[in-house]
UniProtKB/Swiss-Prot annotation:
Keywords: Signal. The keyword Signal applies. InterPro entries: BURP, BURP_dom. This is Protein RAFTIN 1A. One of its GO terms (biological process) is pollen maturation. The lineage of its organism: Eukaryota, Viridiplantae, Streptophyta, Embryophyta, Tracheophyta. The keyword Signal applies. Residues 73-105 are annotated as: Disordered. Residues 169-383 form the BURP domain. It comes from Triticum aestivum.
Length: 389
């Protein structure tokens, strides 16, 4: 895998040098593109950090080759898919619940409790597949709605053994000033190489069928843990959608923005992201201090970063939804965060076994199902204040 990353890094360096972008003073080409097409939308911090200047080649190479080690060190969770677990998944592998180390993905509503490998950090759930069941990665029975007083706020927490962990899904009634929710925010785990220049990203085949050839070209063993993560991401990008849903995967910042514009039917869009500490924050109870609706609905495009050596976003339309920016204050004092929140108002086409229904005690077509957008994930909304589209 290291050879693949070294070769990819070398290609990136050549491309950037050819474009005259080498050096910390010059903005990345993708950053120039963003400013040109989204002049009224500052680059979110998480996205800006992914636009790495390859001038620091040695440092970047160290980060890139560490992708293999990081993938192997991560817990056996992938919170981007709710598909069924293979028969050999073991509940005992679902570690980390007691310490609040579980995180969740909100982009797979079609799967069950499939363990897909440590594709993207300490994550259990996927947020863009609505047709599947309770992909709790072998730990389904350990998760249940809380019996604490917080349940009255419409929250549903993951519980492992006797220890409560972070909120996973919650009812829309919890998005009110004064409500309390327990959250643990994990450290950011961005792709090692960040966003590739578009010409480089477009030159690397991004399909399951092409992956063996790509790996062979760079002499990468096909049985490595990192390759398994890459395969899982490709499968997720190629998986079918539910009726009425649009989905795409973007391997460059330019493709991400252009495809979001295409799906929303207007070039006047804006990104909405959570403001969270990049280093993460420990489990604690947060109190909602203010709630601001996100205009531009009822359909948004939600984008979630995927496990790959370079940045890949998997995006999908949310279906009928309401979105909010929720300001919260942590019980420990000083820990203020703002979470971008999506509440799906029509779940009638979701799989009845979807984990959110189990945690919230509801069913398809019932009350809205809400979840936050983790660090680096993006909601794209029509900019209704500037465009009638």
């Amino acid at each position: 895998m290291a050879r693949f990353l070294v070769a990819l890094l070398a290609t990136t360096l050549v491309a950037v040098q050819a474009g005259g972008q080498l050096g910390h003073a010059a903005p990345a080409t993708a950053e120039v593109f963003w400013r040109a097409v989204l002049p009224h939308s500052p680059l979110p911090d998480a996205v800006l950090r992914l636009l790495k200047q390859p001038a620091a080649g040695v440092e970047l190479l160290t980060e890139a080759t560490s992708f293999v080690r990081d993938a192997e060190d991560r817990p056996p969770f992938d919170y981007r898919d709710y598909s069924r677990s293979p028969p050999d998944d073991e509940p005992s592998k679902s570690t980390g619940a007691a310490s609040g180390a579980r995180d969740f993905d909100y982009d797979d509503y079609s799967g069950g409790d499939k363990l897909r490998g440590a594709a993207s950090g300490a994550r259990d759930f996927d947020y863009d597949d609505y047709s599947g069941a309770d992909k709790l990665r072998g730990a389904t029975d350990e998760y249940k709605a809380p019996s604490s007083s917080l349940a009255g706020n419409g929250a549903s927490m993951a519980r492992g053994g006797k220890a409560e962990t972070t909120t996973v899904f919650f009812h829309e009634e919890a998005v009110r000033v004064g409500k309390r929710l327990p959250f643990r925010f994990p450290p950011a785990t961005p792709a090692a190489l960040g966003f590739l220049p578009r010409q480089v990203a477009d030159s690397v085949p991004f399909t399951t069928a092409a992956l063996p050839g790509v790996l062979a070209t760079f002499g990468v063993a096909s049985d490595s843990a990192t390759v398994a993560s890459m395969e899982a991401t490709l499968r997720a990008c190629e998986s079918p959608t539910i009726a009425g849903e649009s989905k795409f995967c973007a391997t460059s910042l330019e493709a991400l923005v252009e495809r979001a514009m295409e799906v929303l039917g207007t070039r006047d869009i804006r990104p909405v992201t959570s403001t969270l500490p990049r280093a993460g924050a420990p489990l604690q109870t947060y109190t909602v201090r203010s709630v601001r609706p996100v205009e531009g609905g009822p359909v948004f495009v939600a984008c979630h970063d995927e496990a790959y050596p370079y940045t890949v976003y998997r995006c999908h339309t949310t279906g009928p939804s309401r979105a909010y920016m929720v300001d919260m204050e942590g019980a420990r004092g000083g820990d203020a965060v703002t979470i971008a929140t999506v509440c799906h108002t029509d779940t009638s086409l979701w799989n009845p076994e979807h984990v959110s229904f189990k945690l919230l005690g509801t069913k398809p077509g019932g009350t809205p199902v809400c979840h936050l957008m983790p660090y680096g994930h993006i909601i794209w909304a029509k900019n209704v204040n500037r465009s009638p589209a």
